[in-house]
From Swiss-Prot:
One of its GO terms (cellular component) is ribonuclease H2 complex. Endonuclease that specifically degrades the RNA of RNA-DNA hybrids. This is Ribonuclease HII. It comes from the Bacteria. The gene is rnhB. A divalent metal cation binds at residues 24-25, 116. InterPro entries: RNase_HII, RNase_HII/HIII, RNase_HII/HIII_dom, RNaseH-like_sf, RNaseH_sf.
Length: 210
């Protein structure tokens, strides 16, 4: 019997009569910006070659696949949680909320939702129907729809960091993407933090004396 580690969308579709949405997140670790998630329902009649965990792909390849996913997927949706929501809920619960928003925003209700990682929130479709979901450890490298979601989320967040970099070039967001690097620590020590920072994260709390 197949296990989740070896299941593909084709395997899963043989067990169900409906469509599958893959879900993944990007941006749990950075000190600044939204945590970004994506939900993708791929079209089984329009396969996309080269899908993989977004972290294992070059930026150029991610960008190309992003465009192909947007063109060929049956539907996709980005969901997010803001720094204020992260501070209020904590990063785990904010990530679950962002995933729920992504799935609820799909204009097609999937029969099954597959989430990268070791936990899954309760999902409700745009029409209010409850959805079955499963979490799959390292699913972004195993299940095509989760790989696609990881690419959509990663490219979306990277582009947002580029916008933030243009507004605040002294922080170097285009290089470190908001993650807690030495260069980033030096930048916030010199320039302080602004409203897009996650004030509940230890390095930011320490700087603010909270």
């Amino acid at each position: 019997m197949a296990t989740f580690k070896s299941l593909t969308e084709a395997d899963l579709l043989s067990f169900s009569t409906g469509l599958i949405a893959g879900v993944d997140e990007v941006g749990r670790g950075p000190l600044v910006g939204d945590v970004v998630t994506a939900a993708v329902i791929l079209d089984p009649n329009k396969p996309i070659s080269g899908l993989n965990d977004s972290k294992k792909l070059s930026e150029k390849r991610r960008e190309a696949l992003f465009d192909e996913i947007c063109d060929k997927a049956l539907c996709y949706q980005v969901g997010r949680a803001s720094p204020a929501e992260i501070d209020e809920l904590n990063i785990l619960h904010a990530t679950m909320l962002a995933m729920q928003r992504a799935v609820a925003g799909l204009n097609i209700a999937p029969e099954l939702v597959l989430v990268d990682g070791n936990r899954s929130p309760i999902f409700v479709a745009h029409n209010g129907a409850g959805l079955t979901s499963h979490s799959i450890i390292k699913g972004d490298g195993l299940i095509a729809s989760i790989s696609a979601a990881s690419i959509i989320a990663k490219v979306t967040r990277d582009r947002e960091m580029d916008v933030l970099d243009a507004a605040y070039p002294q922080y170097g967001f285009a290089k470190h993407r908001g993650y807690p690097t030495k260069a980033h620590f030096e930048a916030i020590a010199e320039h302080g933090v602004f409203d897009q920072y996650r004030k509940s994260f230890k390095p930011v709390k320490a700087l603010l004396g909270l």
